[in-house]
Amino acid sequence: MKFIDEARIEVIAGDGGDGSASMRREKFVPFGGPDGGDGGRGGSVYVIADRNINTLIDYRYAKKHMARNGENGRGSDCYGKGGDDITLRMPVGTVINDMDTGELIADLTEHDQKVLVAKGGAGGLGNLHFKSSTNRAPRQKTDGKPGERRMLKLELKVLADVGLLGMPNAGKSTFISSVSNAKPKIADYPFTTLAPNLGVVRVGPGKSFVIADIPGLIEGAAEGAGLGHQFLRHLQRTGLLLHLVDLAPFDERVDPVAEARAIVGELRKYDESLYEKPRWLVLNKLDMVPEDERRARVADFIERFGWTGPVFEISALTGQGCESLVYAIHDYLVEHSDAHRAELAEDLASDVRFRDAPGAGGEPHERDAGAH
């Protein structure tokens, strides 16, 4: 099973051109002196964030990206042409690390954000620069500097407002397809979703939010079981988590409470800050529960789970309860938007060292997650 959110690429900046050791030779100018030009600079490699790109799939196949070398200098004070820069377009939310040093180079959080990832080499100096009062005909010149060469690890973190959390087959894909424009693959078996699906939920004119259908979790995900960390990392930038629970599993031996506790346990083992994020409980598949049993089954689940936060009862298949949930999410996001942006800014300031671009344990007891 492939999870298209990681790629490894090599970026190679261009070498600088060599300087020229040349003498001016013209009729009637017997001692023309040096006229060797400088070499051109090597091309650099930049990355730029593009909100119209959703995956890193292109970089799983195109793994080497090279900028052009600078041209050598020539006589008659001719400077070499600089190598052309290249720009790699990547999704907003991509994190770029140097694989050799572990340095965090960039976290692309804004559309059109531009970051230098490999700097081209400087051009060499021609002998024109070495002329002095004691050396009128210098033969010295310098070679161009090599461009930077790096192995980069690209990692995509979904920049969504809301993340869907739950066991495989909890109905997350059905829910996101019913409330948004996303069209994820849906089937009656676990692990239908192998890559995150993003959907834009439109509440009204100018009112919308992004929801991420993250692949289902299994117990042991924090240690890498199933698709492991690849699931959990996508939830780190969301402002709100929806914990979807299948209230009517096909297998009667499955206990929804035990599954819900397992999910929360994995969340806490992976990242305490992720566990502390605002989280709402969404009880799904009510259409599969007889009407005369619904109230009792919901009450029993909440009591056994020890949940005191917001609860929503829905059927993603029929749409029952989805509209009220969507409006509640939108109202919450509007109310807490400033706090979420501040959290992202603080996170960015703590761990990102941008390079300048020219111009540019156990079974947890639940708490009231909606009070954040």
UniProtKB/Swiss-Prot annotation:
One of its GO terms (biological process) is ribosome biogenesis. Keywords: Cytoplasm, GTP-binding, Hydrolase, Magnesium, Metal-binding, Nucleotide-binding. Disulfide bonds: none annotated. CDD domains: Obg (cd01898). Coiled coil: none annotated. Residues 160-334 form the OBG-type G domain. GTP binds at residues 166-173, 191-195, 213-216, 284-287, 315-317. InterPro entries: G_OBG (IPR031167), GTP-bd (IPR006073), GTP-bd_Obg/CgtA (IPR014100), GTP1-OBG_CS (IPR006074), GTP1_OBG_dom (IPR006169), GTP1_OBG_dom_sf (IPR036726), OBG_GTPase (IPR045086), P-loop_NTPase (IPR027417). It holds the Pfam family MMR_HSR1. Mg(2+) binds at S173, T193. Its cofactor is Mg(2+). It is found in: Cytoplasm. Its EC number is 3.6.5.-. Residues 128-147 are annotated as: Disordered. An essential GTPase which binds GTP, GDP and possibly (p)ppGpp with moderate affinity, with high nucleotide exchange rates and a fairly low GTP hydrolysis rate. Plays a role in control of the cell cycle, stress response, ribosome biogenesis and in those bacteria that undergo differentiation, in morphogenesis control. Belongs to the TRAFAC class OBG-HflX-like GTPase superfamily. OBG GTPase family. PANTHER family: DEVELOPMENTALLY REGULATED GTP-BINDING PROTEIN-RELATED, MITOCHONDRIAL RIBOSOME-ASSOCIATED GTPASE 2. This is GTPase Obg. It comes from Burkholderia pseudomallei (strain 668). The lineage of its organism: Bacteria, Pseudomonadati, Pseudomonadota, Betaproteobacteria, Burkholderiales. The gene is obg.
